[in-house]
UniProtKB/Swiss-Prot annotation:
It catalyses: adenosine(1518)/adenosine(1519) in 16S rRNA + 4 S-adenosyl-L-methionine = N(6)-dimethyladenosine(1518)/N(6)-dimethyladenosine(1519) in 16S rRNA + 4 S-adenosyl-L-homocysteine + 4 H(+). Pfam families: RrnaAD (PF00398). It comes from Burkholderia pseudomallei (strain 668). It is an enzyme of class 2 (transferase). Keywords: Cytoplasm, Methyltransferase, RNA-binding, rRNA processing, S-adenosyl-L-methionine, Transferase. One of its GO terms (cellular component) is cytosol. Belongs to the class I-like SAM-binding methyltransferase superfamily. rRNA adenine N(6)-methyltransferase family. RsmA subfamily. It comes from the Bacteria. GO terms for molecular function: 16S rRNA (adenine(1518)-N(6)/adenine(1519)-N(6))-dimethyltransferase activity; RNA binding. S-adenosyl-L-methionine binds at N19, L21, G46, E71, D94, N117. Its EC number is 2.1.1.182. This is Ribosomal RNA small subunit methyltransferase A. The keyword Transferase applies.
């Protein structure tokens, strides 16, 4: 595979994190994992040159029910419009600020499926941005840097377990599906990639906790990974009786599961509410 940044007459732009998928075997495997069906409400993030877009449109789109796509590169938008016409509804803009809820069906029930080969340089902030739309999302299938996927699905007590693990596992059930080597792209990235499936927890499965408070607690815990929680969460001792909570502070952040972080966040929020 050539290392050239040019593919199909388009130069991949580093500032957009562009690496175009060209391996048809991988594309077929991704489409098989997504299983798009006619009439579904689906949006693709960063369609690029349309390698995944075309096969998905063939299974999903009709003139009255197009595939939606969010694309920042205006050069690509013109090419995509010319190629797919009314079967693709393009939204020109940055996925990091895009209102994905605007594409969901009215009523607030899960109706939206999100797919994409996410730009690796913005993957973590984009995943956090998408969390706010989880109530209207059926599922998400993303190509990501393998190291990010490993952190997303990591278990407590492992080196890969991180703030990203806790926050995403709180909101989604996630599975790593497919490993994708660098040579599947043009130009090849310097890292391995993987496909991950993310299914939001149903509302009745979600713990009653303020996500902002949970994020605050988890961020504090992981702020100094090698230090004990007595140091990183020590500032909450005025609010939380950790002994009464059965929470051992003589551990490190990566040793604590999602449920325990939720309990601490609930205690913090309760203490603040009671003044």
């Amino acid at each position: 595979m050539s290392n050239s940044r040019q593919h199909q007459g388009h130069f991949a732009r580093k500032r957009f994190g562009q690496n175009f998928l060209v391996d048809h075997g991988v594309i077929d495997a991704i489409v098989a994992a997504i299983r798009p069906e006619r009439g579904e409400r689906m949006v693709e993030i960063g369609p690029g040159l349309g390698a995944l877009t075309g096969p998905v449109i063939a299974r999903l789109a009709t003139p009255g029910s197009p595939l939606h796509a969010v694309e920042l590169d205006r050069d690509l938008i013109g090419r995509l419009e010319q190629r797919f016409g009314e079967l693709l509804e393009l939204h020109a803009g940055d996925a990091l600020t895009f209102d994905f809820g605007s594409i969901a069906r009215p009523g607030g029930e899960p109706s939206l499926r999100i797919i994409g080969n996410l730009p690796y340089n913005i993957s973590s902030p984009l995943l956090f941005h998408l969390m706010s739309f989880a109530p209207v999302v059926i599922d998400q299938h993303f190509m990501l840097q393998n190291e990010v996927v490993e952190r997303m699905v990591a278990e407590p007590g492992t080196k890969a377990f991180s703030r990203l693990s806790v926050m995403l596992q709180y909101r989604y059930v996630m599975d790593k599906l497919i490993d994708v080597p660098p040579e599947s792209f043009q130009p090849p990235p310097k890292v391995d990639s993987a496909i991950v499936r993310m299914i939001p927890h149903a509302p009745h499965e979600l713990p009653a906790v303020d996500p902002a408070v949970l994020g605050e607690v988890v961020t504090a815990a992981f702020s100094q990974r090698r230090k004990m929680l007595r140091n990183t969460l020590g500032g909450y001792r005025d609010l939380v009786d950790f002994d009464a909570l059965g929470f051992d502070l003589a551990r490190r952040a990566e040793d604590i599961g999602v449920d325990e972080y939720v309990r601490v966040a609930q205690a913090v929020a309760s203490a603040r509410a009671s003044g």
